Amino acid sequence: MIARRTLLASLAAGIAALALTGCQIDTRTPIRVSEILSVAQSGAPVPVSAAITGQFVTEPWCKDEGTMAVETISTPNVPLQLTGCAAAGNGAAGTFQLATNLIRTDGGQSDDVILTNVLEGDTARFAVFPHGKHKDLLSVGLFLNLPQLQAAQQKLLAMPVFKRGGYDGTTNFSFTIDILNDTDKPAKFYLADVSAGGDLPSDEAILTIPPGGQDTVTLDAQTQAKLGTTGWVNFMSMMTK
């Protein structure tokens, strides 16, 4: 299952948190229903931006370590930007923006093939693809380049500034999508992972967002564990009829 929260109560969540070091990394990515439909129909990528928040020991550490993280993790097609550091609680909070894309890919691919086709050597992307045997469902998946992110993490941990910061690489993280329905029809989603060809969940499992409405979907611990193993997960499935 995938946990659902309102916008006011949700934690920030989204992509690329695996490579940063700290106590807690939260990311949040807004995606519009019209963008999902446009990508599925035209195949033209749509830019999306993930807001990332990380905890640091102090504000100066945040600036130093955040700058190193940006230099280590960014790629030309998926740049990471440090947008601010401020005192928060017993430490400091760093805010980042990661620019990536929502693209279209084919369904029914093996894990290795779909990761290669979606990521194309970059760190993180979202993708829309047909959902197996359920022709009226569009899957929205999150894809991470785990080897690249893990290598970046090890490189960061070896830097003197990170060693002085006292980090051991242990990180808690969360992933959230803010779904914004900017169409004139209700948008309906299955939040449970519907296996290809498997039975659809009951109607009670459907998230309905009215025209002009919005809601938030957060990966639960089980789904995050799968993401950390396979490199991608089906975040949600959108009904097209």
What are these regions (language model features)?
Residues M1-L11:
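Bacterial N-terminal signal peptides that target proteins for export
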Residues I73-K241:
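Mature, soluble, non-transmembrane domains
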Residues A19-G22:
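C-terminal motif of bacterial Sec signal peptides marking the signal peptidase cleavage site
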